[in-house]
Amino acid sequence: MKRIAVLTSGGDAPGMNAAIRAVVRKAISEGIEVYGINHGYAGMVAGDIFPLTSASVGDKIGRGGTFLYSARYPEFAQVEGQLAGIEQLKKFGIEGVVVIGGDGSYHGAMRLTEHGFPAVGLPGTIDNDIVGTDFTIGFDTAVSTVVDALDKIRDTSSSHNRTFVVEVMGRNAGDIALNAGIAAGADDICIPEKEFKFENVVNNINKGYEKGKNHHIIVLAEGVMTGEEFATKLKEAGYKGDLRVSVLGHIQRGGSPTARDRVLASRMGARAVELLRDGIGGVAVGIRNEELVESPILGTAEEGALFSLTTEGGIKVNNPHKAGLELYRLNSALNNLNLN
């Protein structure tokens, strides 16, 4: 394989630029030319494709977002869109593609491979909801961003004896809420993977204040419901204290990636090039127990999010990823909670 391309698709995530940089520089070291595709699959179909050099990715490793831009392009789910994209790739003499994104992006990569065009997927999403990897590119940075915000919210919450509901991203997965909540010492963490009763949340809040606490922080994963809906249900369940809602929103996607995300993205990007160099497509690169692994992109894209296959201790956990179950139990123990 003498010429490959790289694109980013779906929601942006810190560390995508680091992954692109690794793809470009590793490929050049292997004697492979690299082309960038702007705006994901939309740019592929439109022919928005251009050569990348080592200088093109200089000083990009510490930048958030993606300099190749990103977009959602539902038309690529249709065969016509897929074939149009492949036709453009062939015009540029491209023989393989590295796709950086979430599960929607993986479906596109899977379709390319089914049409005989090798594609390798890299998990780029803050949600950490990709099967086949313990961690996704951007997750660590997003958690750090949320922890910083929670620390600040605690300051103002304590000053006014307030209860805060802090809504965080994650789509249908509670990984951001769970990890950031524990790291910030949140009082309650509510995630889609674990059922809870609002009456018990109210009891936890009231008990905290009775013991002398001057604030209460609830971290809410967006996959449960919106922060405003949650606040309304808390009041319906009997909570009468001062209650505010903070929605962190897209700030969680931005910012300079952490060292962990930069290293993870660099390792994955380099591995993707090695796979394409060897003529291997239709796989996604992941990390398990700090070791890089590959899994069929078909299974990765079709299996769905974490915590989806089995039920253990009331939490749906997608084996072998057990971090969610362990962390949820840890939070309950540290805060002596009973949300069930």
From Swiss-Prot:
Keyword terms of this UniProt record: Allosteric enzyme, ATP-binding, Cytoplasm, Glycolysis, Kinase, Magnesium, Metal-binding, Nucleotide-binding, Transferase
Annotated pathway: Carbohydrate degradation; glycolysis; D-glyceraldehyde 3-phosphate and glycerone phosphate from D-glucose: step 3/4
EC number: 2.7.1.11
Molecular function terms from GO: 6-phosphofructokinase activity; AMP binding; ATP binding; fructose-6-phosphate binding; identical protein binding; metal ion binding; monosaccharide binding
PANTHER family per record: ATP-DEPENDENT 6-PHOSPHOFRUCTOKINASE, PHOSPHOFRUCTOKINASE
Activity regulation text: Allosterically activated by ADP and other diphosphonucleosides, and allosterically inhibited by phosphoenolpyruvate.
Family to which the UniProt record says this protein belongs: Belongs to the phosphofructokinase type A (PFKA) family. ATP-dependent PFK group I subfamily. Prokaryotic clade 'B1' sub-subfamily.
Function comment: Catalyzes the phosphorylation of D-fructose 6-phosphate to fructose 1,6-bisphosphate by ATP, the first committing step of glycolysis.
Binding site for ADP: 21-25, 154, 185-187, 211, 213-215
Lineage: Bacteria, Bacillati, Bacillota, Bacilli, Lactobacillales
Organism of this sequence: Lactococcus lactis subsp. lactis (strain IL1403)
Protein name: ATP-dependent 6-phosphofructokinase
